[in-house]
A protein has these predicted regions:
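Short beta-strand-centered aromatic/proline hotspots
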Residues: 103, 153-156
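Non-DNA-binding regulatory cores of transcription-related proteins
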Residues: 81-144
């Protein structure tokens, strides 16, 4: 798989997400500052709730912008079957007969993108799965423990 094209697909999706988030933040800001948002009594919290929402939206916008900068300057490395998994590796794993694709990047964990007919999810090296994959190779098993649950991911391919 061409990881440079994958990064471009992620950036395109994030730019679209950013546009939607900015529009939503503007609408929330307008709602928070609108005259109708002034409290009618001591129990009326519409304006306060709108201001909390605006703050959360501003944080999300900042996170997307930060990830876009990281992706713009990302040094995408090429990995082969004998290479150890590290940052910018695209990894195909099998868990319970299902194949999944993970792209390891320092930020943006949980972002999903459709690419070449597959769903690719960003995983950070500090996430449980990201930590389990670090320094493994094709054919190895990544073990992720979550409470009393143990998941084993077989590494099928690395790009």
């Amino acid at each position: 798989m061409d990881k440079k094209k994958l990064v471009e697909a992620i950036r395109t999706q994030l730019e679209n997400d950013l546009s939607v988030a900015k529009q939503a933040a503007l609408a929330t800001y307008e709602a928070a500052t609108h005259e109708e948002s002034k409290p009618e009594n001591e129990y009326d919290t519409r304006g306060l709730e709108a201001s909390y929402l605006a703050g959360a939206q501003a944080k999300r916008i900042s996170e997307i912008e930060e990830l876009l900068v990281i992706l713009k300057h990302l040094d995408v490395k090429t990995f082969g079957p004998g290479d150890k998994i590290n940052s910018t590796a695209l990894v195909e794993v099998e868990f319970n007969g299902k194949h999944s694709f993970f792209f390891i990047v320092v930020k943006g964990g949980g972002v999903n993108v459709k690419f070449e007919g597959r769903t690719v999810q960003i995983v950070t090296p500090s996430s449980p799965l990201g930590e389990a994959l670090q320094d493994l190779r094709q054919g190895d098993i990544a073990v992720v423990e979550n409470g009393d649950q143990v998941r084993e991911y077989e590494i099928i391919n690395i790009w």
